[in-house]
């Protein structure tokens, strides 16, 4: 009798369950708000803890200094033209595929251009680099039966993507929320930096 692999039979998060939790823009914005300010809104410069209702652009006007704050400002989602639900779906697809997902496949699944999918993937991989920063490999690293045509400047991102999923393989359901949390704590990464050395 063969022994079952605990990783192979680990319950992940199903697509319907994911869409129930993160299927609308409002749900995604609320998650980003909760991740960014877990103890409630607080403006760092003036210390105010109160804000007015968001305007049509989802900006939160501070009651004290009247500065408008976006929940996505200072995060990986900053100044994005894509809806947050597209970002969250990319996080789901990237985290739930055992061997990762190509930018071309991501582009087809999300309905975005290949360049947009590449940038989205590399931004999320940078968040994975940040999430794995304390677990960096050093010295010579050997992998069996793997050949990838990866540019050296992106190697750390691809390796971090693999390690991020591997180190969290026993909690596939929590992997999505963990990556969302990591993305809200990762600084913005414009294209010019995403295309440079990782």
PLM features per residue range, with description:
Residues 1-198:
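Residue-level recognition of single "structural anchor" positions
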């Amino acid at each position: 009798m063969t022994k079952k692999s605990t990783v192979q039979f680990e319950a992940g998060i199903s697509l319907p369950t994911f869409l129930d939790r993160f299927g609308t823009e409002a749900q995604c914005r609320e998650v980003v708000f909760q991740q960014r300010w877990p103890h409630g809104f607080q403006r760092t410069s003036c210390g105010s803890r109160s804000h007015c209702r968001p305007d049509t652009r989802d900006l939160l006007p501070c009651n004290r200094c009247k500065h408008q704050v976006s929940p996505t400002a200072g995060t990986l989602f900053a100044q994005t033209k894509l809806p947050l639900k597209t970002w969250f779906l990319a996080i789901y697809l990237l985290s739930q595929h055992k061997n990762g997902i190509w930018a071309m496949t991501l582009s087809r699944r999300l309905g975005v251009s290949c360049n947009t999918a590449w940038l989205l993937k590399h931004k999320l991989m940078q968040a994975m680099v940040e999430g794995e920063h304390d677990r960096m490999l050093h010295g010579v690293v050997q992998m069996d039966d793997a050949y990838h045509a990866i540019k050296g400047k992106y190697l750390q991102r691809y390796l971090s993507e693999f390690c991020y999923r591997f180190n969290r393989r026993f909690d596939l359901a929590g992997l999505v929320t963990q990556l969302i949390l990591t993305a809200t704590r990762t600084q913005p990464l414009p294209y010019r930096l995403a295309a440079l050395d990782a």
